[in-house]
Curated annotation (Swiss-Prot):
It comes from the Bacteria. This is Putative peptidyl-prolyl cis-trans isomerase Cbf2. Coiled coil: none annotated. The gene is cbf2. GO terms for molecular function: peptidyl-prolyl cis-trans isomerase activity. It is an enzyme of class 5 (isomerase). The lineage of its organism: Bacteria, Pseudomonadati, Campylobacterota, Epsilonproteobacteria, Campylobacterales. Residues 131-228 form the PpiC domain.
Length: 273
């Protein structure tokens, strides 16, 4: 069975209008509201308010919506609603939606006891651990000599002076396009994120210090500034309880829906040809 795209499904289903909606565009005399665009892209926005997006992002989404609306208008002009392919695909979509509603009804009947959620957490605490992390900057160059020269330029600097000079040199000399313009900033990472020589060097540093020798990887030679660090720690129950509950609920749902399917199969008259 072919899957309907999010765009196609939304256009077929239509979009609920908000009485307080503001018109953001008109298409062939038809008004387009911010509420329409917001609801249309809701799965993609994942709870983010359309109205708070930067103007360029809002405009891009509005343009996408308009293009889809124009395609819909053109399809109607061509009377494609009577096309056999449309009817066939629509029937498939309706069946899929009906099955989804059926399953959601069952899912909503499943309740997970709070004690069971807590017990799962207590029995699996080793899975809910925040790994040790560091925050660092780096300057990547092609040769060991370049790296040594940079280290010499930074020698003796501390605190804000070191940080500022490091950022300046990163912008000037680093060949890493991903961090160069941010002054070499890499953000936070754990021991599984970077290649081992880089990780080992970064984690071995004290906060606010740089590597005193170049760090060689397959990318070149690095000079690293360790900005901050966080030790390995236990993730609190409140941070993960909703995820645990959802996981347990889904596992129970799979058992229930499989049993339901088996019961229906057993009660049906099925003849294999």
């Amino acid at each position: 069975m072919k899957k309907f795209s999010l765009v196609a499904a939304a256009l077929i289903a239509g979009v609920a209008l908000n009485v307080n909606a503001a018109t953001v565009a008109t298409v062939n005399g038809k008004s387009i509201s911010d509420a329409e665009v917001s609801e249309f892209f809701a799965p993609m926005l994942r709870g983010q308010d359309f109205k708070t997006l930067p103007d360029n992002q809002k405009k891009a989404l509005i343009q996408q919506y308009i293009m889809q609306d124009l395609i819909l208008q053109d399809a109607k002009k061509q009377n494609l609603e009577k096309d056999p392919l449309y009817t066939k695909e629509l029937d498939r979509a309706k069946d899929a939606i009906l099955v989804n509603v059926y399953q959601e009804k069952i899912l909503n009947t499943i309740k997970i006891d709070a004690a069971k959620v807590k017990a799962f957490y207590d029995q699996n605490k080793d899975k809910y651990v925040k790994p040790a992390r560091v925050q660092a900057k780096h300057i990547l160059v092609a040769t060991e000599k370049e790296a040594k020269d940079i280290i010499n330029e930074l020698k003796g600097l501390k605190g804000k002076e070191l940080d500022a000079k490091f950022s300046e040199l990163a912008k000037e000399k680093s060949i890493d396009p991903g961090s160069k313009n941010q002054g070499g900033e890499l953000g936070w990472f754990d021991q599984s994120t970077m290649v081992k020589p880089f990780t080992d060097a970064a984690f071995a540093l004290k906060n606010g210090t740089i590597t005193t020798t170049p760090v060689k990887t397959n990318f070149g030679y690095h000079v690293i500034l360790k900005e901050n660090s966080q030790a390995k720690g236990q993730i609190k129950f409140d941070e993960v309880k909703q995820g645990i509950e959802n996981g347990l609920k889904f596992e129970e749902f799979k058992k229930v829906i499989n049993q339901k399917g088996q019961d229906l199969l057993n009660s049906a008259k099925v003849e294999y040809k």
